[in-house]
C-alpha cells in the first residue's frame, strides 16, 4: 500500500508569470563630412537588410539631418549591430559612427 505523502506545506502555488518585453534601442548612424554616400548605403543594406531604395532614403536623411535611425532592436541586438558597423567602418578607413539610444 502506498503512503500518502501529501504535506500541505509542500503545495506549490500557481502564480501568474508576467513577461515584460525587453527595452528597445534605436540604432543611429551619425553623419560626417568624409564617409562616401555609397558606403553608407552599403552599410544600411548589409547590416540592416534594407533594399536599395530604403537605404538611399535613410542615407539622404543622415546626410541632410545629421543622423538617421537604422532600426529599433532589443539591447543586445542593438549593441551587436553598433559594434559590427563601427568595426566595418574602421576596417574600411571611414569615420562613420553608429550609436544606440534607448527608445
UniProtKB/Swiss-Prot annotation:
Q: Note the superkingdom of the native organism.
A: Bacteria
- Kindly give the InterPro entries that the UniProt entry links to this protein: ClpS, ClpS_core, Ribosomal_bL12_C/ClpS-like
Gene Ontology BP annotations: protein catabolic process; proteolysis
Coiled-coil stretches, from where to where?
none
Q: Name one Pfam family in it.
A: ClpS
Task: Outline the subunit composition.
Answer: Binds to the N-terminal domain of the chaperone ClpA.
Entry function: Involved in the modulation of the specificity of the ClpAP-mediated ATP-dependent protein degradation.
The family annotation for this protein states:
Belongs to the ClpS family.
Which PANTHER family has this protein been placed in?
ATP-DEPENDENT CLP PROTEASE ADAPTER PROTEIN CLPS, ATP-DEPENDENT CLP PROTEASE ADAPTER PROTEIN CLPS1, CHLOROPLASTIC
What protein is this chain from?
ATP-dependent Clp protease adapter protein ClpS
Give the source species: Nitrosomonas eutropha (strain DSM 101675 / C91 / Nm57)
Q: What is the lineage of its organism?
A: Bacteria, Pseudomonadati, Pseudomonadota, Betaproteobacteria, Nitrosomonadales
